[in-house]
Amino acid sequence: MNSQDLKKRQEKIRNFSIIAHIDHGKSTLADRILEKTETVSSREMQAQLLDSMDLERERGITIKLNAIELNYTAKDGETYIFHLIDTPGHVDFTYEVSRSLAACEGAILVVDAAQGIEAQTLANVYLALDNDLEILPVINKIDLPAADPERVRHEVEDVIGLDASEAVLASAKAGIGIEEILEQIVEKVPAPTGDVDAPLQALIFDSVYDAYRGVILQVRIVNGIVKPGDKIQMMSNGKTFDVTEVGIFTPKAVGRDFLATGDVGYVAASIKTVADTRVGDTVTLANNPAKEALHGYKQMNPMVFAGIYPIESNKYNDLREALEKLQLNDASLQFEPETSQALGFGFRCGFLGLLHMDVIQERLEREFNIDLIMTAPSVVYHVHTTDEDMIEVSNPSEFPDPTRVAFIEEPYVKAQIMVPQEFVGAVMELSQRKRGDFVTMDYIDDNRVNVIYQIPLAEIVFDFFDKLKSSTRGYASFDYDMSEYRRSQLVKMDILLNGDKVDALSFIVHKEFAYERGKIIVEKLKKIIPRQQFEVPIQAAIGQKIVARSDIKALRKNVLAKCYGGDVSRKRKLLEKQKAGKKRMKAIGSVEVPQEAFLSVLSMDDDAKK
């Protein structure tokens, strides 16, 4: 194709993604679009086709973004090339969403006709507006008995401020309105800008590792053209590679002769080292490089940290390799090696949130077959010392000595909770119990309220989401973003077994709850840790001060069994001898801590705060 033909082809390209709150029908709509454009034969069709991970199907959520090419013949008789980039809806995967939106010119905003706008719908719309995308509102599930499309249309206009007069009324499940959506994409989503004759600039928005072909890059071509045989260069580190194959996904990978401006596809170039390619980097040609890199993505900072340790210590290197491969297509995962006296060698990992942590743990166990122990999650604290230094601490065992601490600041988040009016009381009570500060609340419509609180991230990390869902019968939707660091009365609590600290059981807690929290854990551990031949004291301590204690009684042999009568001094002698033996044993004995003990600290019940 000459550059004239390529420019004509470029005018027919439409890049768009679908954004929605969880369960508003995003993956179903994607399935219908694939069927309508006959990209996938009815034989290959299955529900949630783009959610290729088993985990995504089981939980019914989208975790990874996916990009596929479709051909659509519009009513004007022209054939258009669509690139549909599927995005996750959950708050923990906002980073995935921002990456996929950067590769698009338009976004379909799916809103449930019964539930209306939810917290994450808003969060994703603001991301789309930041990227200057054309937004097409679609009101989905109009065939539900509880659907109220007119109310939702007003919500879209009032809450988001979009013109919803031309919003498509659709039902992805029943296949209603799909053609209208496709026609609107043709009319309203702009064709990609960019110059085919300019030096190559391609944005890497994802990558996967293939055991045979090395790292495969998923790219959006912004300027220029790339074909097999070209020598490409990464603009961040200058490394060069020879392109072996380029192509598109339909969802299967299909090889092509070239990828030109506006295309979304993959590039394979025998890249063997995972670290050489970074999501957000720009690819250019080595012999005709672009002057500057594309504006990439802002790096996401992890909010939640936890230690991950292999149960079998010889799996340490396998765990490192597994984490490196996961990091390849999940750029927000961070990890560094750490050691623990109780758990041996492992990694300190940073995650965007609890669901992210959960998904990574499951992927490690399923895809790489590694059994893990996770320590309790913690957040990043700013510890100000008496010599006027500020240390960032994400691991309780790194906390400085209490005598050196001047004050501690912890991260607060701005939590936006959308909830039916009848549950406002329950939400406020829960937020208050989690040390939240009320900011404001406003009514979205007659029945739904948007409540905003400032809540410490450490409280959200544990079980805020579960508690919120159970106290509102699942009706509340929740979104949060980082707000600020504030001074708090925090202390580090150590757990001592037989007088020895167990580093993996330490945690940070607010002074007010320290006594109750310590008591609960000590009692829990008493039930879990097996009895020994000697008495084992379990203590919870803040610095040198013991705040709670419980003893595991020793297993005793009845040494008097063979004394059928006889002198009391003989019995006393035997008992004294046993006592001395136990004392010696206690001095040299060590206590085995079962895995459930670490998990019990993780699943801290809220009993302390009731």
From Swiss-Prot:
Per the record, a Pfam family?
Answer: LepA_C
The record's principal subcellular location, in a coarse class, is: membrane
Tell me how this protein sits in the membrane: Peripheral membrane protein
State the top-level EC class: hydrolase
**What GO CC annotations are associated with the protein?**
plasma membrane
Top-rank taxon: Bacteria
Query: Gene3D superfamilies of this UniProt entry?
Result: 3.30.70.240, Elongation factor 4, C-terminal domain (3.30.70.2570), Elongation Factor G (Translational Gtpase), domain 3 (3.30.70.870), P-loop containing nucleotide triphosphate hydrolases (3.40.50.300), Translation factors (2.40.30.10)
Q: Which reaction does it catalyse?
A: GTP + H2O = GDP + phosphate + H(+)
Q: Where in the cell is it found?
A: Cell membrane
Q: Name one GO biological process term.
A: positive regulation of translation
Keyword list (alphabetical) reads: Cell membrane, GTP-binding, Hydrolase, Membrane, Nucleotide-binding, Protein biosynthesis
Q: Domain tr-type G spans what residues?
A: 11-193
Query: At which positions is GTP bound?
Result: 23-28, 140-143
The UniProt record lists the EC number as 3.6.5.n1
- Please name the GO terms that the record assigns under molecular function: GTP binding; GTPase activity; ribosome binding; translation elongation factor activity
Database matches in InterPro entries: EF-4 (IPR006297), EFG_II (IPR041095), EFG_III/V (IPR035647), EFG_V-like (IPR000640), EFTu-like_2 (IPR004161), G_TR_CS (IPR031157), LepA_C_sf (IPR038363), LepA_CTD (IPR013842)
Extract the HAMAP family matched here.
Answer: LepA
Outline what the protein does. Required for accurate and efficient protein synthesis under certain stress conditions. May act as a fidelity factor of the translation reaction, by catalyzing a one-codon backward translocation of tRNAs on improperly translocated ribosomes. Back-translocation proceeds from a post-translocation (POST) complex to a pre-translocation (PRE) complex, thus giving elongation factor G a second chance to translocate the tRNAs correctly. Binds to ribosomes in a GTP-dependent manner.
Q: Which family does it belong to?
A: Belongs to the TRAFAC class translation factor GTPase superfamily. Classic translation factor GTPase family. LepA subfamily.
Q: What is this protein called?
A: Elongation factor 4
Q: Which organism is it from?
A: Streptococcus pyogenes serotype M12 (strain MGAS9429)
Q: Gene name, please? A: lepA
